[in-house]
Design a protein with these regions (language model features):
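Nucleic-acid endo/exonuclease domains
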Residues: 1-181
Length: 181
């Protein structure tokens, strides 16, 4: 079975419910499939596919899939420099950029990172699930604050959050993407 659309104008130029439906089909048709997403992830990071699957398990994602775009290995530093050539930001690359477009045309972009224990924490012998946020290496704190200073919310996940990662991530996505206009 298949559906074929022959249009005389772009789906974005069609208003009303028909326009929304056509735009939904267009976004989903253009959206990369999971295999393409996995191929674009960092092969040296075994947790990126895990984070991607956690994103897809959240109620927020399931309810808004047609309004969400996920970009793996996003060069946020280069992107910010394109928008503002005077920006003083290193060429940061993040695990994922999640773009959410609400029904009113507002776009929210959120940076998502999985922090591996051995690379992102200092004094690892003292780190546990109650204090991990105090043991991030200085570079990670600076990176997060720099990116947030340009208006991009930053969500970090790590091994201490995996037991309830779907709920944790869902709460933050709801907070950043569904905040009142």
């Amino acid at each position: 079975e298949s559906i074929r659309f022959v249009l005389s104008k772009n789906p974005e130029d069609i208003r009303g419910e028909v326009g929304k439906a056509l735009q939904f089909y267009k976004r989903n048709f253009e959206k990369p499939d999971d295999i393409d997403m996995f191929n674009r992830m960092d092969k040296k990071s075994p947790m990126e596919p895990v984070l991607y699957n956690i994103i897809k398990q959240t109620p927020f994602y399931k309810e808004n899939e047609g309004k969400i775009e996920i970009i793996p290995q996003f060069d946020i530093g280069k992107y910010i420099k394109q928008l503002n050539p005077l920006a003083q930001i290193p060429d940061y690359r993040n695990d994922f950029l999640l773009i959410y477009r609400n029904d009113f045309g507002k776009t929210t972009m959120v940076i998502l990172e999985y922090d591996g224990f051995e690379h992102h924490f200092k004094d690892t012998g003292f780190v546990n699930d109650t204090n991990f946020d105090k043991f991030y290496v200085a570079e990670d704190i600076e990176r997060r604050k720099t990116i947030e200073s340009y208006g991009y919310p930053f969500i970090r996940l790590n091994k201490f959050l995996l037991d309830d990662a779907v709920t944790y991530l869902n709460d933050r996505l709801e907070r950043y993407c569904k905040k009142k206009l």
